[in-house]
Amino acid sequence: DSCLVGSEMCIRDRVRTAFSPIVRECGDISAGVFDLEGRMMAQAVTGTPGHVNSMAESVKHFINHFPLNTMFEGDIFITNDPWMGTGHLNDFVLTTPCFKDNKIVGLFSCTSHLTDIGGLGVGPDATDIHMEGLYIPMLKLADKGVMNKTLLKLIGQNTRQPVETEGDVYSLAACNDIGCKRLVEMMN
């Protein structure tokens, strides 16, 4: 129950800090706590069921791309790769390892729809993935607590709403940070 409450509280923080109206007004988001094998331990009640399933797949792929023994406190991983667990390029997944006493104890992940990610926009006119918008493979958004400003600038400059897009990425990162803190508090 504590993990569920923690996930739900993070969702509320994400909705409160969201730049995208689709998050604030429609709840197009999900969040969850995962064990070290990428299995979901709890998910927020608020949110989109489709995001929950895709987010769960993304966490497993993040663990495969970035083995647990290479993760550090303050790391944040990001993708919008539909083949690695997002519905489409507008859905961003951020995953953060949670640490207690310098040991990784779980992962917190959240998914959210961003209003614009470049490209033609949402619709049937795209004939390949690149026409849909900026395609972000599994990357490290933060390394030991230091945000990758180059990646953030790249993301922002490839959208029609750079400020809102960057704000939503930071909001997702904060959601995970709060989730990890609440997980550790629960463990204490």
Model-derived features with residue positions:
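Single conserved hydrophobic/aromatic residue that forms the stacking wall/gate
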Residues: 1-6, 10-11
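N-terminal leader/propeptide and maturation segments of large enzyme subunits in energy/redox metabolism
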Residues: 135-188
